[in-house]
Amino acid sequence: MLDRDGFRPNVGIVLLNQKNQVFWGKRIRTHSWQFPQGGIDRGETPEQAMFRELHEEVGLLPDHVRVVARTRDWLRYEVPDRYVRRDARGHYKGQKQIWYLLQLVGHDWNLNLRATNHPEFDAWRWNDYWVPLDVVIEFKRSVYALALTELARYLPRHEPRNRYLRSGMRTRDGEHAGLFLTRVMSPKPGIQLPPGACFDPIPPTGMPDEREGLPFTAMPR
C-alpha cells in the first residue's frame, strides 16, 4: 500500500525502560541494530499497527507499555534502488513513518523475540537515549535523528540525568551526555553494538527472512 508519492505507511517504536534507556534490536542474521518498526496494513490506524508490531517483534502487549508521545507528522526516508525489487523500481520510493515513544511498565522478562515464527531480531540491548547511529543502516540514520530529537522533549522527567541529555551539558564526572547524533561513523567489520552493549544471540534456526509484502530484496524493515 503506497501513497501517491511512492511511500509506504509505517510505524517506528522508541521503547524506554524505567531508566529512560532505549531498546535496540539486532536485525536477525545481520550486523545492524535498529528500533522496532513495520508497515501499516490496510484498514489499520497507526496506533493499531504500532501495538501489532510491538507484539510481533518484541513480544509485548498493550498492558506492558505506556504510550508517552508520538511524532506530529510523517517522517520519510528513501530506499536506495539496490534494496528495491526491480519490478517496484520507479514507483516505490521508501517509507513514511509515525514514531511512538513508549515506556515499559512491565518487566524485561516480558520481552520475547520469538513471539512469531518469523522473528525480526536475534538479540536486544538497553542503551542510553543518545548514542551514535553508526550501527543503523545508512539510509535510516537521518529519520532516526529526527524522531529521537522530536520525542526527546517528552522523556519522563523522573530520571535525574535527563536534563543533561536534553541540554547537552556534562555530568559531574565530565562525561558528555548530550546530542551525539552528528558522530556517525563508518561501519567496522563484524558485529557492531551500540556503545557499551553486549548481546546473547539466539542460535540460528534456518527460518526464512519474511518481508511480508514489502518491495525489498535485502533491506531491514
UniProtKB/Swiss-Prot annotation:
Keyword set, alphabetical order: Hydrolase
Enzyme Commission no: 3.6.1.-
Domain Nudix hydrolase: 6-149
Entry cofactors: a divalent metal cation
Annotated GO MF terms: pyrophosphatase activity
Record-annotated disulphide pairs: none
Keyword Nucleotidyltransferase attached: no
Residue ranges of the motif Nudix box: 38-59
Keyword Ribonucleoprotein: no
Family: Belongs to the Nudix hydrolase family. RppH subfamily.
NCBIfam families: PRK00714.1-2, PRK00714.1-4, PRK00714.1-5
Functional description taken from the UniProt entry: Accelerates the degradation of transcripts by removing pyrophosphate from the 5'-end of triphosphorylated RNA, leading to a more labile monophosphorylated state that can stimulate subsequent ribonuclease cleavage.
HAMAP family from the UniProt entry: Nudix_RppH (MF_00298)
Name of the protein in question: RNA pyrophosphohydrolase
Organism this protein belongs to: Verminephrobacter eiseniae (strain EF01-2)
Encoding gene, per UniProt annotation: rppH
